[in-house]
């Protein structure tokens, strides 16, 4: 079954499968299924075309998903960088934005270590 350009896994429960769509988390998935009148524990393979269509309609109406959600997130980050605020500077420098320490850790954000040569030890004569 395909929703918002994403192939949902047929063997998973509907509530879990919907979270494979970018922009839909567990709570949103539960709300969508409740509005469509579908039990969350039903598998995607068990849904008929009518139920699938109801899910698609609800998502199209009320949710920003996939490309639209990613685009909005990128626009928000770009705006922060353009206005030159602290958060924007942290994004620009690829450093943690939310106040985490950086002297140690922050490897995910900073990337692989760039080794800096230390002082050579003088040998005794």
UniProtKB/Swiss-Prot annotation:
Transmembrane segments: none annotated. Coiled coil: none annotated. The keyword DNA-binding does not apply. GO terms for cellular component: cytosol; small ribosomal subunit. Residues 92-125 are annotated as: Disordered. Disulfide bonds: none annotated. This is Small ribosomal subunit protein uS13. The gene is rpsM.
């Amino acid at each position: 079954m395909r929703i918002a350009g994403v192939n949902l896994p047929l063997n998973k429960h509907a509530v879990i499968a919907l979270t494979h769509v970018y922009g839909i988390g567990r709570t949103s998935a539960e709300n969508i299924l409740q509005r469509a009148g579908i039990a969350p524990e039903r598998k995607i393979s068990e849904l008929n075309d009518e139920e699938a269509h109801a899910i698609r309609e609800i998502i199209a109406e009320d949710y920003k998903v996939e490309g639209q959600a990613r685009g909005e997130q990128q626009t928000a980050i770009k705006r922060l960088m353009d206005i030159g605020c602290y958060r924007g500077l942290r994004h620009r420098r690829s450093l943690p934005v939310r106040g985490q320490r950086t002297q140690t850790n922050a490897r995910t954000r900073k990337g692989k270590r760039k080794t800096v040569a230390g002082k050579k030890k003088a040998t005794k004569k």
